[in-house]
Each structure stands twice: as structure tokens, then as C-alpha cells.
Swiss-Prot record:
SUPFAM superfamilies: Rps17e-like
Compartments, record wording: Cytoplasm
Gene symbol of the encoding locus: RPS17B
Listed NCBIfam families: PRK01151.1
Subunit structure and binding partners: Component of the small ribosomal subunit. Mature ribosomes consist of a small (40S) and a large (60S) subunit. The 40S subunit contains about 32 different proteins and 1 molecule of RNA (18S). The 60S subunit contains 45 different proteins and 3 molecules of RNA (25S, 5.8S and 5S).
Name of the protein in its database record: Small ribosomal subunit protein eS17
A Gene Ontology biological process term: translation
Originating organism: Candida albicans (strain SC5314 / ATCC MYA-2876)
Pfam families: Ribosomal_S17e (PF00833)
Family the entry assigns: Belongs to the eukaryotic ribosomal protein eS17 family.
Keywords: Cytoplasm, Ribonucleoprotein, Ribosomal protein
Entry's Gene Ontology molecular function annotations: structural constituent of ribosome
Length: 137
């Protein structure tokens, strides 16, 4: 079974990542050396726990954003995604032969909002991918 990490370890790791993200790596040994250089930590055991949790969080950050941790690079990436504008608008009728192809629910929504857009209702069927596991007999 796993061990419970204390609030001290989690808070220290979070602060380390927010302040020194570019210097940290996915390697425990380098994070341990960096932790001992940056912070004054009372014991070797606590330093190792903080470095280990920092390494764990760095690996999670590589996969995607981690709740509770925000650093400059992550904020810039989020800002870029928020400001994204597509090359061609989905509502641009010049690329779709003068009509929008939408499902029945969306057509009702467009009609209730009072837009005068020529629409073509298309039936949408749920596409089911291949099963991940074989059926049992």
C-alpha cells in the first residue's frame, strides 16, 4: 500500500514547482540536489520526501495540467488555447454551399434564437468504436 504524504511535503513541493519549474527535472537525484540547494530543510528524510513528491508532480505535469499548481509556462499555454480563433468559421456559409449541416436539436436552438440562417438537418448516429475487450462466453 502507498503512504500518506503530509501537508508539509505537498505544500513545499507545490511552492518549489511554482518558483523553480525550469530547473526541475523528471529525475529524483537532480531534484534532491536542487531542493537541498534552494531550501533549508531540517532532515534528510523530509528533503527526500519533498524531492520525491516534486518528481512525482513533474511527471504528472508532463501529461497535462495539475490542479492547484500554476506556473508561467502553463498559464501562457492556457491563454493561447483561450485566444484560439479558427481559420474558417463554422458559421461561414461560403464554404458550405450556402447551408449549415446541423442536427435536429441544434436546428431547434437556432430557430428559437431567431437566427435567419439556412440550415440542413442531418441525422446524427452515435458511432461506436471497437470493443477493447473480447466478449466472454
Amino acid at each position: 500500500m502507498g503512504r500518506v504524504r503530509t501537508k508539509t511535503v505537498k505544500r513545499a513541493s507545490k511552492v518549489l514547482i511554482e518558483r523553480f519549474y525550469p530547473k526541475l527535472t523528471l529525475d529524483f537525484e537532480t531534484n534532491k540536489r536542487l531542493t537541498s540547494e534552494i531550501a533549508v530543510i531540517q532532515s534528510k528524510r523530509l528533503r527526500n520526501k519533498i524531492a520525491g513528491y516534486t518528481t512525482h508532480l513533474m511527471k504528472r505535469i508532463q501529461k497535462g495540467p495539475v490542479r492547484g499548481i500554476s506556473f508561467k509556462l502553463q498559464e501562457e499555454e492556457r491563454e493561447r488555447k483561450d485566444q484560439y480563433v479558427p481559420e474558417v468559421s463554422a458559421l461561414d456559409l461560403s464554404h458550405t454551399n450556402g447551408q449549415l449541416e446541423i442536427d435536429a436539436d441544434t436546428a431547434d436552438l437556432v430557430k428559437s434564437l431567431g437566427f435567419k440562417i439556412p440550415v440542413q438537418t442531418v441525422s446524427i448516429s452515435a458511432q461506436r468504436g471497437p470493443r477493447r475487450f473480447a466478449k466472454r462466453n
